[in-house]
Amino acid sequence: MSRLVVVSNRIAPPDEHAASAGGLAVGILGALKAAGGLWFGWSGETGNEDQPLKKVKKGNITWASFNLSEQDLDEYYNQFSNAVLWPAFHYRLDLVQFQRPAWDGYLRVNALLADKLLPLLQDDDIIWIHDYHLLPFAHELRKRGVNNRIGFFLHIPFPTPEIFNALPTYDTLLEQLCDYDLLGFQTENDRLAFLDCLSNLTRVTTRSAKSHTAWGKAFRTEVYPIGIEPKEIAKQAAGPLPPKLAQLKAELKNVQNIFSVERLDYSKGLPERFLAYEALLEKYPQHHGKIRYTQIAPTSRGDVQAYQDIRHQLENEAGRINGKYGQLGWTPLYYLNQHFDRKLLMKIFRYSDVGLVTPLRDGMNLVAKEYVAAQDPANPGVLVLSQFAGAANELTSALIVNPYDRDEVAVALDRALTMSLAERISRHAEMLDVIVKNDINHWQECFISDLKQIVPRSAESQQRDKVATFPKLV
């Protein structure tokens, strides 16, 4: 049986609590436990890159981690992955800060990681690469003679050609991506956007619906919407509340709660969300004194100017809205710029009447799915969800809104606050059914199954891939 080798920018710590954070770690550990194998990634520390890999083995899984120099971390991670790819892939070209040394550093680190992984690989290993930090990784492995099956999953959106082609190195990135055997995306829109970018650059031959050839390289594209652990989330959400939370719930028993939790990131649409809540207060004064909106937004990448700007903007908007609409004994908006334990958040989800999840652009947004999974099926809250979140393709029974239209969001919030119990139960049941079917284990099992079905590349095909090809004639 083939081993599974997983490569991601960071690896979860090898202890029994690693999966408690949810998300990617749960899916990866599930796949690794099933097949046995290796999880390879950055240690999270800076230091001498020439030091031997740190290896830890538990059961049939080995964790292998490495350090990065401060220069490599800054250029590969901060300056290119997060200052070029992240904003561009979230349709924010105005925030892209392209610098040629950062691009060189991005390629250099991907090559370095390929060098470090190469001695660990076995001939029949199946390799699964994750996310935008490692777009060129398969290309670097192929250059080193690796013919193993290599899959890639992009957790964030893939932009349309008008956005992607603005990147000075877009053509190189596209050709490098074709060195993967299987390219996985969150949504069909993302998959088609990638193919549109590719067909604008070179001739793409499609042998079947999702099997393609470009530059002489054969690859497959597919959609794998990432899921969650609904049973675990329901378990975390149920049970007694911590004393302070129980006291707060008692104090707010006559108040309807709108709740939202996101990383402090410009892609999440937080300023637009605050303005939509203000529109609700303005257009529906009957809710004054009877509702409260709580926004939790812990700082991420606090040293980046764009993130500092949005933090200050939110602080100002929260103060302005509370000053305009607040009353003695009633504060309409609570904004908390701090981290909360994930299990506590699931309990807060459960007693919230409305979950407000309105990113401007998001690959999936697991918060939306977690909110649904945390609800009491007999008395569930209502999910208000952005049409630009990948989750909107699955959670069609949510109240789907355009986050740029504050009036539309306000109308949806009013509808959510006044929705009948019967409708709430019906909508929740439909969404929960989808979430249970497409859980995190289903996601990883589908990807790994498809990757296993691909015939490994041969040395001869690697040589054929080096034959010159020409761009599509326009």
Swiss-Prot record:
EC identifiers of the protein: 2.4.1.15
Sites annotated Involved in alpha anomer selectivity: W86, I156
GN (gene name): otsA
Keyword Ligase: no
Biological role stated in the UniProt entry: Probably involved in the osmoprotection via the biosynthesis of trehalose. Catalyzes the transfer of glucose from UDP-alpha-D-glucose (UDP-Glc) to D-glucose 6-phosphate (Glc-6-P) to form trehalose-6-phosphate. Acts with retention of the anomeric configuration of the UDP-sugar donor.
Pfam families (UniProt xref): Glyco_transf_20
Enzyme class: transferase
Binding sites annotated in the UniProt record for UDP-alpha-D-glucose: G22, G23, R263, K268, F340, L366, V367, A368, K369, E370
Protein name, entry field: Trehalose-6-phosphate synthase
Catalytic activity: D-glucose 6-phosphate + UDP-alpha-D-glucose = alpha,alpha-trehalose 6-phosphate + UDP + H(+)
Family label: Belongs to the glycosyltransferase 20 family.
Domain of life: Bacteria
Transmembrane segments: none
Organism, as annotated: Escherichia coli O157:H7
